[in-house]
Amino acid sequence: MKLFRLTAAIVLSFALFPSHTLAEYAEDRPRIGLALSGGGARGGAHIGVLKVIEELGVPIDYIAGTSMGAIIGGLYAAGYSADEIEGILAETDWRRALSDQPARRDRTMRKKEQEAQFLIPYRVGFNKGRIQLPLGVIEGQHLDQLFHRMLFPVVEIRDFDQLPIPFRAVATDLVTGEEVILSGGSLPDALRASMSVPGAFSPVRIDDRLLVDGGMSNNLPVSVARDMGADIVIAVDISSAMLTEEQLTSVLSVTEQLTNFLVRRTTDAQLASLGDQDLLIVPELGNFSAADFSEAIKIIPNGYEAASAQGEALEALASGGRSTPRQQVVNDSSDYLVQFIDIVNGSRLHDEIIRSRLAVNSGEKLDLAALEQSVDQIYSLDVFTSVTYDLVENEEGESGLRVNAVPRSWGPNYLQFGLELSSDFSGSSDFKLGAAYTRNALNALGGELRVVGSIGREDELSFDFYQPIDSQARWFVEPQFYFRRENYNYWEDDVNIAELEIDGWGVKFGVGRNLNSRNRLRLDYEFARADADVITGDLGFPLDDEIEIGELVMQYLHDSLDSLWFPGSGTFHRWGYLYASESLGASGDYEQIDGNGSLVWSRARDNFLLNYELGYSFDDAAPIERWYRMGGFGRLSGLVPNQLSGQQAMLTTLAYY
């Protein structure tokens, strides 16, 4: 099914009916409006109702919707059929749509490396000495993109009365609590605003107003349909029932009940306004959750059944099935010529950083798939709360593309925390508590300061400054300064004979080339000084108590894994060559070559992950602090961490999940 392109034909009934007869019928019959209530994922029932309306030929002159009712109603008003909307609902990846994490393939190599530092990706803003949180758990970037893709055929229509069916979306002003009726502007933005449940989704700013879910002010917009000109209103109520006392079992259920109070109050007020000429359809939805969008398609038959039960009343409105013609919009992205590009950028980043990532050029036809990929890459810069696009026209009548990049209200300073615990249940355990401070968009080219600290198994404090030196971040420099204390146990014949502590500081300076989002080359120089002490035991060989490091490291990194922890596709390879000499500041001369990687094979729901590690020290000349170490979870799990050490290493593991 083609979800994102409406057919090029205009559906006309003139072949069946003389034009004067059709016109007279359209003028004489009462105007019918459709009011679709909010109800989250329960909105799948609206599709079932639309199927019956189509089958019976009921003419719909106006549509007003709230929240999920606005989404279903907006798609129908834009020209999609009930079957096409069902296809969209079935094929949408709701897990991705309701997530703000960019696809890993679109993230920069730097962001991929940072991901490995903290298992949990969540963070908080930190500005002027205060913690700041986002205005919603979900900021909605992927929802925005989903709506723009679905409604691309009508994205140029700014007056909702000009849609195939005139349409209104209902939202609520977060500041005043007033009902806001959206009758024009960006249709994707209107739908996004109407369904922004406070707290769950960030509000949407339209015309200098912060808008949230319309259910707070008018969950069943009967009055809106009436004001549009409807003589008869078909109202479909899918709102959730109030929770019983037995169902109020936690703070979450109490919060849900408070929301139900507001929604139920506005719904009841609209129900009271229905007259004898109007029709109310209330699908029986039982315990279907308003939050589980993956189950929404299963609710369609409930809506169909409820509408069919009122088939006689609907047939009377159909007047023999002579519905007015529906015009389906003609709009193919490949026919749209981009004559200019506008960048609306509220961040410190230079506009060229955004423009250089657009796979769209002035004077070319628009490629929607390429544009969406570009939007993903801009969003993955981790600076913006949303990146959207509009088709616009300038004063000269030229057609163009406008990219809207809205910076995060709770950035660009972020704090992130992590805790690592491990135990072999035989007396050996470790912990590591870490925190990171990140300052994004320090300058027009996207410089970034990152401070990472940890205590526990390894104490470390590092200051890292990453500076791209061109708008596409192809070249970069990265100076770093760090303090570090590490403890190593030295084993011999499965006996821990000594504990070694290395305490020191170091500086690194790197220059690199990002070949693309999957491949990178870099060269680093590291200079470090540290003290080494044997805390307990005896190594059995002399140890230099002063460590001097002066090294050049050349590295190639490839990372196309779709997930760091449980990948289903892609590969990972890191290979490096290390050269140290007295002339560089080291205590001696030594060379190493090493690498590690992962390869994934997937078949249906079965995944196989092959990991490898290789390390080789030329002439066995590497000092003890540069020995390879193995042992611990996933790296010979039967051994304690770093139980094996030496000048050479090789390990291969195979995992199934």
Question: What are these model-predicted stretches?
Answer:
Residues 22-66, 74-376, 380-387, 392, ...:
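Patatin-like phospholipase
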Residues 241-243, 349, 363, 410, ...:
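Short beta-strands and strand-coil junctions in structured, solvent-facing domains, enriched
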Residues 369-374, 386-561, 628-634, 642-650:
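Gram-negative/organellar outer-membrane beta-barrel architecture
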Residues 7-17:
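Bacterial N-terminal signal peptides
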Residues 1-5:
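Positively charged n-region of N-terminal signal peptides that target proteins for export
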Residues 450, 464, 571-657:
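C-terminal transmembrane beta-barrel domains of outer membrane proteins
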